[in-house]
Amino acid sequence: MREGHWDTTHQGVDGQHRLLAIVESGVTVRMNVTFNAAKSQHIDSGNIRSMANRVQMSDYDMSWTNNTILSTANLIGRVFAGSNLSHEEALSEWLMKYRTQIESATKCIKKATLLGLNSAGTTAAIIVAAMNDVPAIHIEKFMDVFYSGFTNNEAELYAITLRDELLRENRVKRGTNYARFAFFRTANRLNQYYKTATGQRVAKRVNNGDFPYNVYDANGGIVKPETKKAG
């Protein structure tokens, strides 16, 4: 490539990675350029771009995002419609506003060998918890116990309870239904763990539809309570 042997192919530079590679090579390359192309479509095929693809092309630096983060944001947007995350610009602004919390929380996510423990719902819950100022050290400890299945104290039993619940429900729920269940149940069990670990009072029972945290939109506003419904 540095010697100028670069094939742009029929796709031209319809991909930021191609353009970046050309720029970094320092070699002049002849190519066709399309002006005023719709960002919502692929230039070469005309096919509609995915939301994830459009977000990556936004005016913000989204190089830090990945499929896990974007699928999690999509789930939050569907469950809490007032967050307006189904719209590209609002989603991009939301991701940037809460980048610190999102990156901190997703560092605790691992690829589990037990499929029931891999859910966008669990990721969504710990991101929202981080947005509600649950300390990273407590989220990390909760998730460590959740993945390992080993506990050392009473508070950590809530992580084991969640683990058992998700493995059980994964046998009867699928897709969005399971993700919504994992979202709400993880949030509740994490809240119980955190409050118990810090000596606060917390209800032992979790009712369907209960959600212990606020969900915020890109402007920092709290999503209206009527959108807080479990699927």
Language-model regions, residue ranges each:
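Short alpha-helix boundary/capping and kink motifs at helix termini
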Residues: 1-36
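Solvent-exposed functional surfaces
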Residues: 23-231
